[in-house]
């Protein structure tokens, strides 16, 4: 399934510290974006927020340090000893299934898993060759697109799960109804829905919906000058601030001002 869903991770201070590129069709059905983070010398923190996506993160200075990160529900802070550079492949919702046959529910609880434990050795080696030989971000993106496109397959997505995900996406501004009555419209019970989403999305149904709404607000905050973007998504401002802080670890005002990459000894 394809959703035009483009999450954000917040801004990084510095002109060239963080780069992103979206792949062209047809690969964009599976991969949402490529990204590259360049960290200067020093002890740094990278403040990552939930986005419902699976990321493949590769240390450009040490390919053995490459791993998959599953979706998560609260902010995750990565501690980085710079200088260092990381390249990432952010998959669309369920897009990782085009490469990974192991259900997310069987490895997502670990927190991170080495790519070699989830992918065939030839795919990992082909990606290694690209990372080793391509010396620029654009070349890496273009070469990796060819590698991934040759390896990716159309995974069988349970139509009931697809209906649920599309329902969440199309009703992101409303209070999601995940009762047995609503779940029956997807073709299953609320209990079956919980089991299905946990197995394939990595989160419980309500949590998945909360992250979609959170990401919708983040994009609105980036695009608008108004401080009342919450009006389209939450009951009131206190509800908005409370849930925003629960997911991001900071208040909306703090997030708008901060660089998500910051020095260990400095404030955000």
Predicted regions and their residues:
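Alpha-helical bundle regulatory/interaction domains
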Residues: 1-180, 186-190, 204, 225-235, ...
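Conserved active-site tyrosine of GNAT-family acetyltransferases
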Residues: 31, 240, 244
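Alpha-helical DNA-contacting segments of helix-turn-helix folds
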Residues: 157-159, 168, 197-221, 243-260
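Conserved binding-pocket/active-site segment within a compact domain
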Residues: 180-181, 196
């Amino acid at each position: 399934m394809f959703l035009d869903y483009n999450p954000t991770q917040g801004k990084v201070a510095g002109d060239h510290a963080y780069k992103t590129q979206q792949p062209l069709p047809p690969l964009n059905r599976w991969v949402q974006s490529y990204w590259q983070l360049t960290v200067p010398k020093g002890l740094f923190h990278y403040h990552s927020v939930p986005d419902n996506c699976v990321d493949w993160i590769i240390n450009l200075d040490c390919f053995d340090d490459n791993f998959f990160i599953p979706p998560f529900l609260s902010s995750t802070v990565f501690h980085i000893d710079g200088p260092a550079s990381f390249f990432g492949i952010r998959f669309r919702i369920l897009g990782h299934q085009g490469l990974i046959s192991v259900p997310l529910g069987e490895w997502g609880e670990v927190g991170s898993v080495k790519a070699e434990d989830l992918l065939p050795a030839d795919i990992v080696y082909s990606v290694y060759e690209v990372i080793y030989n391509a010396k620029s971000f654009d070349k890496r993106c273009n070469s990796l697109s060819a590698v991934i496109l040759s390896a990716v397959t159309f995974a069988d997505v349970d139509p009931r799960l697809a209906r649920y995900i599309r329902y969440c996406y199309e009703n992101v501004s409303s209070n999601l109804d995940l009762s047995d009555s609503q779940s029956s419209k997807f073709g299953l019970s609320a209990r079956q829905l919980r089991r299905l989403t946990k197995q394939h999305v990595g989160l419980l149904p309500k949590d998945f919906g909360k992250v979609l709404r959170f990401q919708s607000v983040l994009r609105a905050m980036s695009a608008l000058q108004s401080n009342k973007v919450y009006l389209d998504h939450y009951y009131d401002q206190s509800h908005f601030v409370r849930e925003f802080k629960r997911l991001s670890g900071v208040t909306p005002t703090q997030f708008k001002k901060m660089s998500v990459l910051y020095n260990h000894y400095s404030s955000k």
